[in-house]
A protein has these predicted regions:
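Catalytic-core regions of glycoside hydrolase
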Residues: 160, 180, 204, 211-219, ...
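Acidic, contiguous N-terminal accessory segments
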Residues: 3, 11-85, 115-119
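C-terminal non-catalytic alpha-helical accessory regions
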Residues: 147, 422, 426, 433-436, ...
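Structured segments of extracytoplasmic/periplasmic soluble domains
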Residues: 35-46, 104-112, 173, 177, ...
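Surface-exposed patches in mature extracellular/periplasmic domains of secreted proteins
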Residues: 45-52, 114-121, 185, 287, ...
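Feature activates predominantly on carbohydrate-active enzymes
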Residues: 16, 32-35, 39, 72-78, ...
């Protein structure tokens, strides 16, 4: 993008700009035009909006034509920008392609102090098929009367969920970073979002809250849809709504119970109602946590979940297939996918990139084999940058680390999609651990902007030239911190050098990884010097960093002077 903006036709001062859209412009094309208009207005241009007539009739006026084209040389979500004289055409392979083509123009305006430095000829499209971030409707404590993962959507538990202005800011951030999916994590969301004719008592919130939820989720999915964003609802299995379970004398979750016709019917109808009611939604299915056997996983996925999705589509008269994601956690993904792919094609698998941490851009070992096995199943594989306890609570944002990590997702794991957790404070969304001078808490989107921008940029294209990227990030950081690109280079170096610290510390000194790891949460001396006294994950050491030694192994070699070191610890020791 940064390099593309160097190819331009310079505009002479502030002027009138016309934005033309066809008479049948889709909601995504109209959204693109509005976003472009807002940017040009802020840059001081007089903007004329023209829908219907797309004839370039006045060569004296700078004109931008937005259109969807049936150009099979472009990938999905791809675009083609051409500039000849005063006419710039943005042609999208689809509505999302127009959105991203307009984002290219918007970035060119913002990165050139408001000049209309548009590309003369540029084609681009994303590498990764799904590129998205998640927000959790979950908490670290149980609600009264509920079990783990059971959090109905209510203003008391999640007041931020009902803040439309905050959602618009979040969705616009996703668009600006070329992301096309929003993942919402919750144990059993359906009883907060849909009513079932056969099970009216299953609703888990009061009528007033249900109306709020209905209105908010409709708002969220509609706003996401016009931005080309799928809202993908995650849920655990098998979890029942509390009033449904109580009505039939059941537990809300019981890992040892078999699938019954009643439980299957309730879940299938819940999924169907969800698909029918809300636009541009998908599902992220976790078969782990509350299922009995792998055989049950296959039956549940193919005879309950997929039929529920198809029922919802049939009610709408739709023939497309929304994305259906299968999380590899605690299930046999291959067995499930082998049974599911013949009956549903738009399937994805998902697995954690470095487990529940961020430790390396050189993954290897048995955990990497899980990824390669999944990516060979015949569907798109998603790399999940999962909860990142080793980065807590500090800000982190190394462009170099992220670019290399995304390259590893492609080259080592075979992944072609991204699921991204917040950089820190997942359980405390939307706030960070920081306080502002006025005593208010800082928002994650304000503090951790570089987290989303780096992952979004490299999910779109991880093959960018490193020299160009240094220039790009120097400029971005210079704009953000109000300094020159040259001075901002020092900030970038600080981000990149400090970005190696937490990953290296955990992969060499931690006893495990993720939301259970103790390195930064209060590690005992005995855990540091003799991890074998505790539960360690051998796969972590074998997979989430370069080959090396634990501290106890390093010291033993030093004591015996019998073997050469094979560890990053040697360089740390020499320092």
């Amino acid at each position: 993008m940064f390099a593309a903006c160097t190819l331009f036709l310079a505009a002479c001062g502030k002027q009138t700009v016309k934005i033309m859209t066809p008479p049948d412009a889709s909601n995504r094309v109209q959204f693109s035009a509005e976003q472009l208009q807002t940017t040009l207005d802020k840059a001081g241009y007089q903007v004329m909006m023209q829908q219907g007539d797309t004839t370039f009739s006045d060569p004296e006026i700078k004109t931008i034509l937005l259109t969807e084209v049936n150009d099979t040389t472009l990938k999905k979500e791809g675009f083609h920008i051409t500039t000849t004289g005063n006419l710039t055409k943005v042609s999208g392979r689809d509505g999302s392609g127009v959105i991203y083509g307009c984002r290219e123009l918007i970035d060119c305006v913002n990165d050139s102090d408001g000049k209309l430095n548009f590309p003369e000829d540029l084609k681009d499209a994303p590498e990764m098929v799904l590129r998205g971030a998640c927000v959790g409707l979950q908490k670290m404590t149980y609600l009264p009367g509920h079990g783990v993962y059971e959090y109905p959507y209510t203003p008391e538990s999640f007041p931020w969920f009902y803040d439309k202005e905050q959602w618009i800011k979040y969705l616009d951030m996703l668009v600006a970073n070329r992301m096309n999916s929003l993942y919402l994590w919750n144990g059993h969301p359906f009883a907060s979002l849909v009513k079932l004719e056969d099970y009216p008592f299953a609703l888990e919130v009061d009528e007033e809250t249900f109306k709020k939820n209905e209105e908010m989720f409709s708002f969220l999915t509609e706003e996401a849809d016009k931005r080309g964003i799928f809202v993908i609802q995650m849920f655990y299995n098998i979890i029942l709504s509390k009033p449904f379970a109580e009505h039939y004398g059941l537990k809300t979750q019981d890992r040892n119970r078999p699938i019954t016709p009643l439980i299957a019917d309730y879940t299938r109808k819940s999924i169907a109602a969800f698909i029918e009611k809300y636009p541009n939604v998908g599902l992220l299915v976790c078969l782990g946590e509350a299922m009995c056997t792998v055989e049950d996983d296959v039956e549940w996925f193919t005879e309950t979940i997929i039929p529920g999705v198809k029922d919802g589509l049939q009610a709408l008269g739709r023939t497309d297939e929304p994305p259906l994601l299968l999380r590899a956690h605690d299930t046999d993904c291959k067995l499930v996918m082998d049974a599911a792919l013949p009956i549903y094609k738009n399937l994805y698998t998902m697995h954690k990139y470095n487990g529940e941490s961020l430790t390396t851009y050189e993954p290897r070992g048995p955990w990497s084999k899980i990824h390669t096995d999944l990516s060979s199943l015949g569907s798109i594989h998603i790399s999940n940058v999962h909860i990142l306890a080793n980065l807590e609570p500090f800000r982190w944002g190394s462009p170099d680390f992220v670019q290399k990590a995304v390259q590893a997702m492609h080259n080592v794991h075979g992944a072609n999609a991204l699921h991204l957790y917040p950089q820190a404070s997942y359980w405390d969304w939307p706030y960070t651990a920081d306080k502002l001078p006025n005593g208010e808490r800082e928002f994650q989107l304000d503090r951790d902007w570089i987290w989303y921008q780096t992952w979004g940029r490299y999910a779109w294209n991880c093959r960018r030239d490193r020299t160009d990227e240094i220039g790009y990030w120097n400029h971005q950081l210079g704009k953000f911190y109000g300094t020159s690109d040259e001075n901002a280079g020092n900030i970038r170096i600080a981000y990149e050098e400090s970005g190696e610290i937490a990953p290296k510390l955990l992969r060499r000194f931690g006893i495990t990884e993720g939301n259970r790891q103790t390195l930064l949460l209060g590690m005992f001396m005995s855990q540091l010097v003799n991890p074998y006294k505790y539960t360690i994950y051998p796969g972590f050491y074998e997979s989430c960093g370069p080959e090396g030694e634990k501290l106890i192994e390093f010291v033993e070699k030093e004591w015996k002077r019998s073997e050469e070191h094979t560890s990053e610890l040697q360089s740390l020791y020499l320092i």
